[in-house]
A protein has these predicted regions:
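Functionally critical loop-and-helix segments that line ligand-binding/catalytic clefts
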Residues: 43-66, 71, 213-264
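Hydrophobic membrane-insertion alpha-helices, especially the h-region
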Residues: 15-35
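Catalytic domains of cell-wall/extracellular-matrix polysaccharide-remodeling enzymes
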Residues: 158-229
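N-terminal hydrophobic targeting segments that direct proteins to the cell envelope
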Residues: 31-45
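Glycine-enriched alpha-helix->loop->beta-strand junction motifs that scaffold or abut catalytic
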Residues: 76, 94-95, 125, 211-218, ...
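N-terminal Lys/Arg-rich, disordered targeting/topogenic segments
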Residues: 1-13
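Flexible, glycine-rich phosphate/dinucleotide-binding loops
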Residues: 107, 136, 204, 227, ...
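Substrate-binding cleft of extracellular glycoside hydrolase catalytic domains
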Residues: 39, 43, 50, 54-184, ...
Length: 264
């Protein structure tokens, strides 16, 4: 005797049903990842981020030896603070660019530069190299040291950066500006690109000549402010205590606009 075949009832999944399933899968993924994240990031809250900017960038050196490049992201909580906790995050943005320390003075090389440089490029993060300037050293030697360490730049790489933070012993404000201009002109002539100048808002006001600030893109450091105290700036380093997912500890965090980043 043939058994009567039972009809299988078709289940129709609506758009709302698909959304619910996706939300459930996402919640399960968070639950699985949660212990791992908590174990790695005990202190998960960092600086408050400024409003109105959409391109985040980091600047790194030997002090950030271990970076999970494929995981890099800036997460903020409900109060606008950076966080490493995915369960507290209400907004997530990618890290769009990274400035990497290459050299200092006339002979020092950052031991993690080449590794960071390679990994940033490999993971599609726009990269730039910076030189920490020493006003007590020969400017042309410093420029050549930077050029030899960094090597050629691709079209997608950011312009070279001159990091000016102090007037070193044995030099003056006048000497610093004269030497900085030699470095900038030497590097610009070599790469065919106008370098960026990094400094704090107060140092720019007190020490840098208009010949520098009016003719080169400015990357300004100014913490704890709604906007930087600098008339002409392209990139703003707004904190040195940010939490960035993929980096243990605190890190410098910067903002700019998409258009500015595109034009550099």
């Amino acid at each position: 005797m043939k058994r009567k075949r039972r009809k299988i009832k078709k289940i129709k999944i609506t758009g709302y049903g698909l959304t619910a399933i996706f939300a459930l899968l996402l919640a399960l993924a968070v639950l699985i990842a949660k212990p791992h994240i908590k174990e790695r990031h005990l202190d998960d809250r960092g600086c408050k981020v400024p409003t109105g900017f959409y391109c985040y960038g980091i600047d790194i050196s030997k002090y950030q030896p271990d970076i999970e490049w494929k995981s890099l992201m800036v997460m903020t909580d409900a109060k606008g603070h950076t966080t490493n906790s995915i369960t507290k995050a209400t907004d997530i943005k990618k890290v769009s660019y990274a400035f990497i320390k290459a050299t200092e003075g006339a002979s020092m090389k950052d031991k993690y530069f080449h590794n960071h440089w390679k990994n940033a490029g490999k993971h599609g993060i726009r990269r730039g190299a910076y030189h920490f300037f020493r006003s007590s050293k020969d400017a042309r030697q410093q420029a050549m040291h930077f050029i030899q360490t960094v090597g050629p730049l691709s079209e997608n790489d950011l312009p070279p950066v001159l990091d000016i933070e102090t007037i070193h012993k044995g030099s003056s404000r006048k000497t610093l500006n004269e030497k900085a201009l030699i470095w900038l002109e030497t590097v610009e002539n070599h790469y065919g690109r106008k370098p960026i100048v990094y400094s704090s808002a107060s140092f720019i006001e007190k020490n840098l000549y208009k010949e520098i600030t009016d003719n080169y893109p400015i990357w300004v450091a100014h913490y704890g402010a709604e906007r930087p105290r600098c008339d002409k700036w392209h990139i703003w380093q707004f904190a040195d205590n940010a939490k960035v997912y993929g980096i243990d500890g605190e890190v410098d965090l910067n903002v700019t606009t998409e258009q500015t980043l595109k034009n550099l």
